[in-house]
Amino acid sequence: DVYKRNLVEMNLRQIKQGNIQFPVLMQDTLMSLNICPTQYDTYLGLGFYENNMFSLTGKHIGSRYYYEYPYRDKQEKEVKNRLRGMAYQGTLSSNKSLNRFVFAIGSAPIFSLYSVNKDNIDKSFEFVGGYPEYKTEDTGTTRSAPMSVANKMAFIKAYATEKYVYLLYSGNSYKEVGVKAFNGKIIYQLAWDATPICKFVLDFPIMNFCVSDSDDTIYALMDKEEVELVKYS
């Protein structure tokens, strides 16, 4: 819950029984956008931190920060990290063992693979295929980074399993197709060492997806005027 700054646990069985009281696993004090638990009793955070992109928080390590948002050159590096991060928002997804995760950016073809240990985050791979065009607006009290409508949307969603990473790719711009730019027909599958495995070309654009633990089935939300749940196996 971003507004309450809480990470809560939702039990589907209890929800079906009408119980909507969710236990709080962690209360975030860092203004994170997303939080994922790790197998080491710590929490990985993604946010517009002052100088960094990720945080790692736990009783035995406190709060530590890692890496910064991408930049194409020295000039873009001078843009404040919190402001630059608004142009490089994306999807964070971890494997079931909670010791590896992927961060894929929506506004540009950039993704990174990471591993988590007891007190550190290590980047194992990064792919950079381009950078977004955007403006920066910072009044001191408000900040934003409006994007160019000509930007080609890249990795709309990411999903991770024990063996593989999956990236949903758009390749379209808002200028060309409007909000359909936030859907994609291509899913790239790669191993955690970044070895390409497969490229799935779907028959119709999808807006979101997940993959079975055995990696043999893809479930997707398809927008055909009405949203449909589809299965690929």
Model-derived features with residue positions:
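Structural signature of eukaryotic scaffold interfaces centered on beta-propeller domains
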Residues: 32-40, 82-105, 150-161, 210-214
